[in-house]
């Protein structure tokens, strides 16, 4: 009879008195020697995804800083003289554009950053969060585009018909905001919340949360939606911008072609002729600003919508087309439009800033000196001082008295003053 306390018949058991850490130890008793999985931090995503988030953060900070500066400059400077109703209308449109850029950058960049950093919402709030995010993105993009087109239209009417009927800026600005919200409703119904499966090894918080509904549908559904988005968000504003900027360029070209007439040699026959009308320098600056805003809108939004249309007509399956690398990169370029718009305004309209005047004066010294030397060399042969020009010749009234007796001609009047240097501030 065997001893019941023999070591040969005792079942091997773990020493329960010793604390064990199964999550960080190796299972040496297993045949394959596999490690027991322990708690690990969630993956952080690919480097391109992190770079995308960094660029979105930089653009968001730049957009908030620039547009806040524009709003403080236009809304807070009430201590100066009243600039007049026309300037008030232009300032009102610029304030609306700055507010639209703030709304667009916050709706696009801030919503994406919050979505990626905070992680997946609850399933009950997933669809609502997706639709609200797309509503903010589409409406902000549309409001900014509509106000850029409205500014170009207002400048076109102010240049072509200065004394004509004024544009109802407040009503059209309210209509632009309302139209942007209405046209942004369809994008809210083409997305749904879909959390990634838990078995996915390379899933990070916020990955593929909002997906389109076009994966199980035929391809033409996605193509129709892409066409609608391109026409409403890009083609229609570009058509209005092309009409307004085309008229602006025509007026600018006509007024510029009449300007060389003023530089022709002075003759007595031109004494009674009136000089051609030219655009004021401040109006030229606002015209240039409108053209720059239009070109910036086209340059920033054209690659994004081209990538969207290319993804819709590609041979790839219509899955998560919102998350393609090219479309995501073009979205960053589109959001950059909201950060560059205030810089354009500050470049063209900051003429009364003391630092800006010093910078323009320092940069314009060289070209001003060259223009003055050219004018002096051109007029040196036939231009003298006024008293030397008159003495010892008789004065004008003496010449008029002697015209009938001696038949002498009236001395020509002095030449007009040369135009100011082009480097001087327009303000």
UniProtKB/Swiss-Prot annotation:
Task: Tell me the segments the record calls region Disordered.
Answer: 402-427
List the ranges whose topology is Extracellular. 1-3, 72-89, 192-230, 308-327
Q: Where in the cell is it found?
A: Cell membrane
Intervals, Cytoplasmic compartment: 25-50, 111-170, 252-286, 349-427
Q: Does the keyword Cell membrane apply?
A: yes
Q: Domain of life, per the record? A: Eukaryota
Keywords for the protein's UniProt record, in alphabetical order = Cell membrane, G-protein coupled receptor, Membrane, Receptor, Transducer, Transmembrane, Transmembrane helix
Could you tell me where the Pro residues compositional bias lies? 410-421
Coarse class of the primary localization is: membrane
Pfam families to which the protein is assigned, alphabetical: 7tm_1
User: What Gene Ontology cellular component terms go with this record?
Assistant: plasma membrane
**Membrane topology, record value:** Multi-pass membrane protein
One Gene Ontology molecular-function label: G protein-coupled receptor activity
Transmembrane spans: 4-24, 51-71, 90-110, 171-191, 231-251, 287-307, 328-348
InterPro entries associated with the record:
GPCR_Rhodpsn, GPCR_Rhodpsn_7TM
Q: What does this protein do?
A: Orphan receptor.
Name the family: Belongs to the G-protein coupled receptor 1 family.
Q: What is this protein called?
A: Probable G-protein coupled receptor 150
What are the top taxonomic ranks of the organism? Answer: Eukaryota, Metazoa, Chordata, Craniata, Vertebrata
Q: Which gene encodes it?
A: Gpr150
């Amino acid at each position: 009879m065997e001893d019941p306390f023999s070591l040969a018949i005792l079942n091997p058991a773990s020493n329960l008195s010793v604390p064990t850490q199964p999550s960080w130890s190796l299972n040496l008793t297993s045949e394959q020697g596999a490690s027991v999985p322990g708690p690990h931090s969630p993956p952080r995503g690919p480097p391109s995804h992190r770079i995308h988030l960094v660029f979105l953060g930089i653009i968001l900070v730049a957009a908030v800083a620039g547009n806040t500066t524009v709003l403080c400059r236009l809304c807070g400077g009430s201590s100066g003289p009243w600039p007049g109703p026309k300037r008030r209308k232009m300032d009102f449109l610029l304030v609306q554009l700055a507010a639209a850029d703030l709304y667009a950058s916050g709706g696009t960049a801030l919503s994406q950053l919050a979505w990626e950093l905070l992680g997946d919402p609850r399933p009950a709030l997933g669809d609502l969060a997706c639709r609200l995010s797309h509503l903010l993105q589409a409406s902000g993009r549309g409001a900014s585009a509509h106000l850029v087109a409205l500014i170009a239209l207002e400048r076109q009417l102010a240049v072509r018909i200065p004394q004509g009927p004024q544009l109802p800026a407040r009503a059209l600005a309210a209509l632009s905001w309302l139209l942007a919200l209405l046209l942004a409703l369809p994008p809210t119904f083409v997305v749904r919340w879909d959390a990634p499966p838990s078995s996915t090894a390379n899933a990070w918080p916020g990955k593929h949360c909002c997906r389109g509904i076009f994966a199980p549908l035929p391809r033409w559904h996605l193509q129709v939606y892409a066409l609608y988005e391109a026409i409403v968000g890009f083609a229609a504003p570009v058509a209005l911008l092309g009409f307004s900027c085309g008229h602006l360029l025509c007026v600018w070209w006509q007024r510029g072609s009449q300007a060389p007439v003023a530089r022709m040699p002075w003759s007595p026959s031109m004494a009674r002729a009136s000089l051609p009308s030219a655009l004021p320098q401040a109006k030229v600056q606002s015209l240039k600003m409108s053209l720059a805003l239009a070109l910036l809108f086209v340059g920033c939004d054209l690659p994004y919508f081209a990538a969207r249309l290319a993804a819709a007509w590609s041979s790839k399956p219509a899955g998560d087309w919102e998350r393609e690398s090219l479309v995501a990169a073009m979205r960053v370029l589109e959001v950059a439009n909201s950060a560059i718009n205030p810089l354009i305004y500050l470049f063209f309209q900051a003429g009364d800033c003391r630092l800006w005047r010093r910078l323009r004066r320092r940069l314009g010294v060289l070209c001003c000196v060259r223009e003055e030397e050219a004018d002096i060399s051109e007029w040196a042969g036939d231009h003298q001082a006024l008293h030397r020009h008159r003495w010892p010749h008789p004065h004008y009234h003496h010449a008029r008295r002697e015209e009938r007796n001696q038949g002498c001609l009236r001395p020509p009047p002095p030449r007009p003053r040369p135009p100011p240097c082009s480097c001087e501030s327009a303000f």
